[in-house]
Each structure stands twice: as C-alpha cells, then as structure tokens.
A protein has these predicted regions:
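Thr-biased low-complexity repeat/linker tracts and other Thr-enriched repetitive architectures
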Residues: 1-153
C-alpha cells in the first residue's frame, strides 16, 4: 500500500484487527500507537515484535501478548522477561516460552513445573538443579516421554 494509506489509522486498525501481523506494514507512528498494538497482539501475541521499542516495555501490552502466544515473551523488553507474573502467563500458554525467561526464573520451581506440565520439552530450558530433580523430570516425562533426554546425567 502507498505510504499515506499505511498511515491511515482507521484503515490500519481494521487490518490489525483481522491479522495482527499487518502491524508490520503500518507506518512508524502507528507502530507506536498503543491501541493499535493492543489490537494486533490480541489477534496474535507475536505481533509484539513489530511494535515500537517503548511499547515492548509496556507491561499490560506484553502481558496481553504472552497470554495469546507464550513465545511472544521473546519480543518483550528485558525487564519484563524477569517479571515472574509475565513469565508465568507465558509458560501457561506455551511451556517452551521458558527459554525466553530471565535466568533466575529458570530456577523457579513453581514456574518450571508449570512450564513442563504444559510442554515436557520445556525441561531443556530449566536450570541444571531442576533437570536433576526426579519430581520435576517425572512431571516433564508424564507430559512428553521425549523430555527424558533433557534430564541431567
């Protein structure tokens, strides 16, 4: 579309409500428009990647994104990857989102249990002591037998 059309707020809002990834084609000012980005991440959390940098640090926006797609945690700002509630919401939606969490949270027993309960293969992203924990490994292999490969030696 021509640049003026990609800057047409009403038109772009209509587009992102139908496909969050349409945010990729929006004008720079619209990628910084909170309502626009919220509409996009409600459709697909991973659309957060196309938001202006300051909005990737917006807790409410990022939380909406990870609730829709756990792996959208990848696109959230660094401090949000260390936010326990944020990471818990992400791993509840997709256990493999654990890979994008701040290192200290990969050692959080409750959080890792939630992640491996959702997807056993998330065990590969857990801190080493949890990979050696029988109870944690059992939880992971009950969800996916192949998770055994990620248990500590």
């Amino acid at each position: 579309a021509a640049e003026p059309l990609k800057a047409d707020r009403e038109l772009v809002l209509e587009a992102v409500r139908r496909s969050g990834f349409a945010l990729l084609f929006a004008s720079r000012p619209l990628k910084a428009d909170r309502e626009m980005v919220m509409a996009a991440v409600r459709w697909n959390g991973k659309a957060l990647q196309y938001a202006a940098e300051p909005l990737k640090a917006d807790r409410e926006l990022a939380l909406e994104a990870v609730r829709q797609s756990g792996c959208a945690l990848l696109f959230a700002s660094g401090p949000l990857k260390a936010d326990r509630e944020m990471v818990m919401a992400a791993v509840c939606q997709n256990g493999e989102a654990l890979q994008f969490a701040a290192e200290p949270l990969k050692a959080d027993r409750e959080l890792v249990r939630e992640a491996v309960g959702q997807n056993g293969k998330a065990l590969q992203y857990a801190a080493e002591p949890l990979k050696a924990d029988r109870e944690m490994v059992l939880e992971a292999v009950c969800q996916n037998g192949e998770a055994l490969q990620y248990a500590a030696e």
